[in-house]
């Protein structure tokens, strides 16, 4: 089968189209013909991990070295990128009961990766579900990562109708899904993003948008019941005045300082709280997003598609920083 392979860390130039063996499903696995996979932050990080410093790593510093060892210190252990996808089940293992050949699915495979290829094997107990029937493969492929992360993290800070929420980093995979989920829950949503993506965030349903290149949301006098910081670039001290007395600062990416702030607010039992958490990968979140997408309450807006052989160009396009919505690699005509 065809796949995009990288055997060394570096720029998009390390990505090469190659012929590799087609996988065969184990008794508890499904073989999926991949039609589409988006280029996300995890792909860019994994491709260039050797050149990433601990300060650039969007998690606490003690996790940097274990992560580097897991990915491969000098060269990548996983040589095919792609952690989310949409495609069609081609074959199933003898013990599989959830799926059958012909099923159209979407999935998140996490650090295992492997979606930049024509085929991938996924455990039938994994984070995989039937895709929304009203979405194309390319559209459906953009949903799993954001759906799982945003759904899981928002459960840490349950929203009530009418509450005010600010999403910092509203145009990325997690942020764009968080905007839509918060709106679905009845919140008043403000999205923070850069100039090129203001229209995109508005199209997701945000009530207000803030261009961070023109305005500092911590200085505009507004207060929020929840600030969901996807990027983890702000400090609690700087934005606590933008929280209501019982407001929550929820982080998807964070450093040790934020963890200490979380412990401090928990110990002092002050009204305001800092929450740092890892997302749980639950297939039910995919099912829930599928139903919302079928009902037209979740949108999948694509910036641009690239064919598999242009994966390197897709990475360059994403790294240039001008994208408005997900960028998708299509691996067969039906996935476009």
Predicted regions and their residues:
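A short acidic, Gly/Pro-enriched loop at the edge of an enzyme's catalytic core
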Residues: 219-226
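C-terminal capping/lid region of NAD(P)-dependent oxidoreductase domains
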Residues: 297-301, 315-336
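A structural motif shared across PLP-dependent enzymes of the aminotransferase-like
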Residues: 111-124
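Short glycine-centered segments of the SAM/dcSAM-binding site in methyltransferase folds
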Residues: 104, 164, 247-248
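Glycine-rich phosphate-binding loop and adjacent beta-alpha segment
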Residues: 230-298, 330-336
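Short, well-ordered loop/turn sites that connect or cap secondary structure elements
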Residues: 99-100, 159, 243
